[in-house]
């Protein structure tokens, strides 16, 4: 039995964010690769690329001491359900939002930090 690319894409589209994160982690473990390593290619022009960066990723490194407040902030910022937001908070470090503007990233970072999370903008 063979699964087509279209079937895989349809299955991915039906998954929640947390299910996709878990799938990526399972793929990294099974194939011995890291999805983050592919993003970090730059070489000698990395400094110039950083100056021109227009899209940013907000990464929560820890939920801190007030996990409930962080889960509420995650739900508000991402539109996730309670279970998915709780799973995201507990699986830190995790990308909360990717490919957003600098202003949006800074606002999200401030919101999550006020709730008690430790956050980085990459």
Curated annotation (Swiss-Prot):
CDD domains associated with the record: Ribosomal_L7_L12
Keywords, sorted A to Z: Ribonucleoprotein, Ribosomal protein
Keyword Ribonucleoprotein found: yes
GO cellular component, one term: cytosolic large ribosomal subunit
Any one Gene Ontology molecular-function term assigned to this protein's record: mRNA binding
HAMAP family with a match to the protein in the record: Ribosomal_bL12
Assembly, per entry: Homodimer. Part of the ribosomal stalk of the 50S ribosomal subunit. Forms a multimeric L10(L12)X complex, where L10 forms an elongated spine to which 2 to 4 L12 dimers bind in a sequential fashion. Binds GTP-bound translation factors.
Protein name as catalogued: Large ribosomal subunit protein bL12
Lineage, uppermost ranks: Bacteria, Pseudomonadati, Pseudomonadota, Gammaproteobacteria, Alteromonadales
